Amino acid sequence: MGVEFVDLFNQWASSYDDTVSGNDPEYKEVFEGYEDMLELLAGLSISPVMEFGVGTANLTRKMIGQNKVVIGIEPSSEMRRIANLKCPEAAIYDGDFLNYPQLITPIQSIVSSFAFHHLTTSEKIEAIQKFDDKLESKGKVIFIDTLFKDEAHKQALIKNAEKSGHLNLAQDLQEEYYGYLDELKEMFSNQGFEVSFKQINNYAWLIQAKKGE
């Protein structure tokens, strides 16, 4: 993950909760049903959980509230500061999808919300290989993230954002590394995961990938 994203996260930390709560009109549709998405993700997680891209600990708090053991990984120092204030019960470490402390805790599920798209295609493949190594037998990867069904879907979302005057969103959709459904399916399947996808809103999808025996 590039350092440019870490700088962005540090700048975004103070206003992140406002954005995901729907107070930013540009991203309101992206995060439509945000609390319900986090409740779904938390409920599906299996303890002990490793969470990538903790952010301001919105998902972390829900899993802790369900008495789950959570190990959080977050590259932004400012996000970690806020997360530790909001959720001191969780262990939150500096790191990202590719570089993080090697802990001895057996991991039953790996979760993330709106973070996997910060990885390039090759980085996604490497991360999935690491998930396979890290997870216990039959462990699960459970993500919610923006992705595209295909190129036509991507272009339609960009056009809709531009038409609505949401130029920052349109730029994000063009420049960040949002995956395509078939591409992500192939990445997980090639590593031996059984993967499924469910659309949550116009942008967000639930991704579940189960490791084999």
Curated annotation (Swiss-Prot):
Name listed for the protein in its UniProt record: Uncharacterized methyltransferase YrrT
- Which keywords does the record carry? Methyltransferase, S-adenosyl-L-methionine, Transferase
Q: Name one GO molecular function term.
A: S-adenosylmethionine-dependent methyltransferase activity
Q: Which gene encodes it?
A: yrrT
Instruction: Give a GO biological-process term.
Output: methylation
Give the originating organism: Halobacillus halophilus (strain ATCC 35676 / DSM 2266 / JCM 20832 / KCTC 3685 / LMG 17431 / NBRC 102448 / NCIMB 2269)
Q: What is its EC number?
A: 2.1.1.-
Its family remark reads: Belongs to the methyltransferase superfamily. YrrT family.
Q: What class of enzyme is it?
A: transferase
Alphabetized InterPro entries for the sequence: Methyltransf_25, SAM-dependent_MTases_sf, Uncharacterised_MeTfrase_YrrT
Function summary: Could be a S-adenosyl-L-methionine-dependent methyltransferase.
SUPFAM superfamilies according to UniProt = S-adenosyl-L-methionine-dependent methyltransferases (SSF53335)
A Pfam short name: Methyltransf_25
Listed binding positions for S-adenosyl-L-methionine are 53, 74, 96
